Amino acid sequence: MKKLIFSFFLCGATMFPAFSQTYQELSERAVAATEQDSLSLAEKYIEQALKMEPANPHNALLFSNLGTIQRRQHRYEQALDSYTLALNIAPRAIPALMNRAALYLELGKDDLARIDYSLVLDIESDNQEALLMRAYIYMRQRNYNFAKSDYERLLKLAPQSYNGRLGLATLEQKEGKYEAALSILNAMIAEKGGEATRLTTQQYAVLYVARAGVEQDMKHVDLAMMDLEEAIKLDASQTEAYLIRGQIYLSQK
């Protein structure tokens, strides 16, 4: 859910004739260095390009890329500053808005993240990632009606969205609508092995854990234990499965 968006600056000189070749070369070298995980070198190239043409409107791309580099280095405040500088130049740049929103969310600044995702949706109303992430924030903030609205909008655009369906099932569970939650999860699990969906074993394990959580809430502990066993069989790294199983064991003492 927290994907980095890196705006690659690979446009040719014919597309942007105003660029000097050196500016273009520095930008391309920054991309190449980033792809090779030479982040400090990439940052150096970007800073040189910015100094060379400080008024260039396409510096928005460079600032956005710089923010992503800084984020990968865990220099979060500097990354926020870079994303904001990008948006000062290009306020409607969706990649920069998405990057900043994801970083705000990572830092626990949910309201600021929600604002940026909302700005994205004002520009591009069918942006599926923005809908998904805003729904997630609304759910965390217990704004369940708004969360449901976003999940439903997302599922109209992408009916088979794994994260959208799982998110809606989680929302139904939080509202105590256990049968509705089970209906969604049962349908997703029943599709296992079908041509319509190609999920990983880890994704299926998450579904079994999610269903076990609903069954636990419904006091159907035997069913929950069966689903937890299946989840662990599919993916032994499912921490949540062990936690729920431990809770069930404790409740039976």
Question: What is the role of each PLM region?
Answer:
Residues N65, N99, M133-Y136, G167, ...:
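Canonical tetratricopeptide repeat
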Residues Y23-Q24, P57-L61, I94-P95, Q128-E129, ...:
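Helix-start (N-cap) detector for alpha-helical repeat units in TPR-like alpha-solenoids
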